[in-house]
Amino acid sequence: MRGCNKKKKAKYIVIVFFAIIILGRFFIPWAIEPENFRDTKNKINSFINRYTIPDSYNAKSLIAVDLSNNNDFVSKRANEQQTPASLAKLFVIDYATTLVDLDDVVLAKNEAISLTKQGSSVANIKEKKYYVKNLFAAMLVPSGNDAAYVLADYCGGIISPKATTSKERIEVFMKNLNEYLKQNDYKDTILYDPSGFDTEAHTTVLDLEEVVMDLLKNEWFKDIVSQTSYTATLPDGSMQTWKNTNTFLDPTSEYYNKNVIGVKTGSLSDDFNLVVLYKKHGKEFLICSL
């Protein structure tokens, strides 16, 4: 009888041993993923390191890049398509640079301005002349949807001089923009509205990473996106000032971070998107979040 009990006990020990191995094999890799047990991990870290527990960050997709070596050191669902919202303007500007120069003069038409959706962000563009660089700044700093329509209208006129209305010119621009995206390997991005005020559009953080890295090669871009507010000098000599929607740049904001030097925010409905350029210890890091 005693020998039988020993065999049963040994059998249970073996079963428990293998159960632990199997559990460890599948559970531990899952548990160490950043999004799993986030609250518990934060509490443990806060106890060990004695810091305040941060709010959980629940981005659907995320990528972080060390620009010194282009290494993606954080990645979460980087290939998953999401709504870009106002970050669509980054692709619009990138394509527009292939058609126009910064000092080109654009007459903002009321026909194009009036296409701006009610309740969306604006740069208070008037029916007057602007430099292309002014319009870029108006799209990047206050995230002006009106500026996006004016730019798309102007560029569409270059592509198709026979187009007779702003709507036609913008449609031509968007069609050619999407062709440009395909040709330049932004394979997971498609846009239908130059302002980004569109729930049908989609992109990925990988495509965002590529377009922003391309734009960051331009000093004018880095200068614009790094400023808390931007004052533009228009062709007629007048000036217009815009406040940046990126509160990380605002010293008066509770979210201010001295290490943030750009780039852009984007929101639509319940989607809050962000592209951050972060500088520390002489290195720059790009964070794209959707």
Q: What does each model-found stretch correspond to?
A:
Residues N5-K8, I22, S86:
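Short alpha-helical segments used as structural interaction elements across diverse proteins
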Residues K6, I28-P29:
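Conserved SxxK-family serine transpeptidase/carboxypeptidase catalytic domain
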